[in-house]
Amino acid sequence: MIPRSYYWLLLASTLLMASAFVVSKLFIVDGIHPLVLVASRFTLAGALAIIWLSLRRQLETPKTLSDVGGVFLVGTLQTAVLFGTGFIAMEHLSAATISLLTLTMPIWVTGMLALINRKFPPLLQLIALGVGMAGVALIIGSGVSQAGMGELQWFALALVGAACWASATVFTKTSGLSITGWSLNAWQMLVGGGEVLILALAMDLPGIKLVLVSDILLFIWLVVPASILSFGFWFSALKLGGAAVTSGYLFLIPLFTALISVPVLNASFAPMQLLGGVAVGAAVWLMSRSPT
């Protein structure tokens, strides 16, 4: 029997992850460059997580060149590319839309594993793939009809990020890395954040200027609760409920993002966007119920 704490961990982690999209959008609207925000957030979050794990003597370190390469690959795909593309797209799209497109990751994973294993997915997964693709089409179609074809590139950019996250997930599932959980997340955040930091410095982008107390508090929230704690709670939930069941609740992230966006960002959504969001959420839920 799954303990009640599992659902509290699940609720806390998805709510914190959702808040990260909204807070990031606030900073981007205020003029902070998306790449600078990614670099600052994840370099600091990764460093703090590594220090915290070291103090608790729970930090796992890469032991072979294969592990080092694996950590760099995951960090590049799951932090640098995922959030780099997502935050750039967020300059033009709503936080809820980016959240929805990012959370198509389980759908991409299913397709990739089917190609790698050369095995036809189970019927329920095929249904989920179809529903998910229809949902993405509705979200993109509604957005393009409102803003024009010029916005299509930003939807595509967010989907590229989701596909890269899926690639990192497939790699961690199949590579047998010796580093897992909290430690892998800490290292990959530091690596990905560091890569984007180097890029931001090379582009001579202006740094973050946090003048108001509210800005400082929001940035602390973005780094600690919305980055370090959210993933920590998520890993704890995975241990209690298993990956299959837990991944079915990923749809809560775009749902919470949309709910928070309404009062904080004065967001509004077209009926087709809402229908597409429901379809993507249903697809993720169906994926978790499908036999592997």
What positions do the PLM features span?
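Glycine-/small-residue-enriched transmembrane alpha-helix faces in small-molecule transporters
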Residues: 1-40, 147-174, 194-198
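Specific transmembrane alpha-helical segments of multi-pass solute transporters/efflux pumps
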Residues: 16, 20-21, 50-102, 138, ...
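Transmembrane alpha-helical segments that form core, pore/gating elements
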Residues: 49, 109-111, 115, 146-204, ...
